[in-house]
């Protein structure tokens, strides 16, 4: 970064405090979910450190892999393992939540279908062909990877993300259903 030295020292101090506070939170907090979020703060602070060192790709990989995958995996595994709390209104609150989720997901699905149907794919293909002229201008590998992911491999990339989302929702649903069948009647 081309900033004055005093500003760089201030930014590094803030990043170091984020790493220190996040690490202390991981160790000292009793709730495992709060510890997981503290771990996320630590990972984000480390990625900011990489940004200061002009390692943009490493910073992006840090955020995507550690914060986006590992930290989310920890939070979901904790949510799946914890026993549900005793609640008398569990069935009504669950039905209300299911209905709200159904409405939101159905409206999102219909919105996406309408966008897909209204998109003129032939124009997108012609734009893609016209951008081939500018391909030699790209200098770094990060720019080439980003260009390929957003042009040639856009549809497989998005389909893979939807597939992972469906697998995650299915795993959560299966875990909740198996937990409901395994609990004795006095705990429900």
Swiss-Prot record:
Single GO cellular component term: chloroplast thylakoid membrane
Quaternary organization: NDH is composed of at least 16 different subunits, 5 of which are encoded in the nucleus.
Keywords: Chloroplast, Membrane, NAD, NADP, Plastid, Plastoquinone, Quinone, Thylakoid, Translocase, Transmembrane, Transmembrane helix, Transport
Reactions the enzyme catalyzes: a plastoquinone + NADH + (n+1) H(+)(in) = a plastoquinol + NAD(+) + n H(+)(out); a plastoquinone + NADPH + (n+1) H(+)(in) = a plastoquinol + NADP(+) + n H(+)(out)
Protein name in the entry: NAD(P)H-quinone oxidoreductase subunit 6, chloroplastic
GO molecular-function term, one example from the UniProt record: quinone binding
Keyword match Translocase: yes
Top-rank EC class of the record's enzyme: translocase
Gene behind the chain: ndhG
E.C. number(s) listed in UniProt: 7.1.1.-
Membrane topology field: Multi-pass membrane protein
Family listed: Belongs to the complex I subunit 6 family.
InterPro entries registered for this protein in UniProt: NAD(P)H-Q_Oxidoreduct_6, NADH_UbQ/plastoQ_OxRdtase_su6, Nuo/plastoQ_OxRdtase_6_NuoJ
Transmembrane intervals: 10-30, 32-52, 61-81, 97-117, 153-173
Role according to the record: NDH shuttles electrons from NAD(P)H:plastoquinone, via FMN and iron-sulfur (Fe-S) centers, to quinones in the photosynthetic chain and possibly in a chloroplast respiratory chain. The immediate electron acceptor for the enzyme in this species is believed to be plastoquinone. Couples the redox reaction to proton translocation, and thus conserves the redox energy in a proton gradient.
Locations listed in the record: Plastid, Chloroplast thylakoid membrane
Pfam name, any one: Oxidored_q3
